[in-house]
Amino acid sequence: MSKADEKYLDIIENILENGYYDNNRTGIETYKLPHQIMQFDLSKEFPILTTKFVAFKTSVKELLWIYKDQSNDVRKLQNENVTIWDEWMLEDGTIGKAYGYQVAKFKQIDNLIDTLKTDPQSRRMLISLWNIADLKDMSLTPCCYETLWDVQNGKLNCMLVQRSGDMPLGVPFNMCQYAVLVHLIAQVTGLKPGLFTHVINNAHIYKNQIEGMKIQLKRRDKAYEAPKLWINPNIKNFYDFTADDIKLIDYKHHDKIKMEVAV
């Protein structure tokens, strides 16, 4: 069994058994738990679920849209056949001053890469998408809103802080795509990928997702080993990466589990 399946399904079981039943802004009740944490050693294994299909290529395209293209334009994703942001698209075709807009506004990727190269022991390396002044102009405030970076013995560590985690749908995307981000940043800074820690402040399962999660839990004993991540070794500039430069090798998985996203 992959570490991703093991740690993820442990949280799912905990929420279903011990979660607090609550209302929220969507109108669909949730079972939730605070402060859930998963940690993966990226030098040993790539974290993606095998107990259900995760649309890895779509998650990579979204990641590059945010951090490489530094875009808030949903139409760019649609041109890549990615529709996951359609529900939050505003009349101008964007999601407002959210996600990639904040990366570009403060040149956050450039600053991170420069610091990793010139002052890798800095304790001030972080990317924040939570700009209080612009929250009112975002169609959706960022769920994965902060990453903190650290270097130890030539390995790049990253902590992802997620304020709100839709465990069945959002979190499987986020855990693998931010692991990819660590690999990409490590490659262009001459480092090796190290620890990836995923902190979820509010980990929840919507009431209409419970049956789907029970199906996935039944697959625990039939989980597969983790696939290998391949990144084009010739890419040395972060902005040269494309989705075709990032692939999974031997990704074995169970079938997709259809569940609805709460808007």
UniProtKB/Swiss-Prot annotation:
Residues forming the catalytic site: 143
Species in which this protein is naturally found: Clostridium acetobutylicum (strain ATCC 824 / DSM 792 / JCM 1419 / IAM 19013 / LMG 5710 / NBRC 13948 / NRRL B-527 / VKM B-1787 / 2291 / W)
Molecular function per GO: thymidylate synthase activity
Coiled coil (residue ranges): none
One GO process term, biological-process aspect: dTTP biosynthetic process
HAMAP family assigned: Thymidy_synth_bact
Designated gene of the protein: thyA
Protein's name in the database: Thymidylate synthase
Stored Pfam families: Thymidylat_synt (PF00303)
Keyword set, alphabetical order: Cytoplasm, Methyltransferase, Nucleotide biosynthesis, Transferase
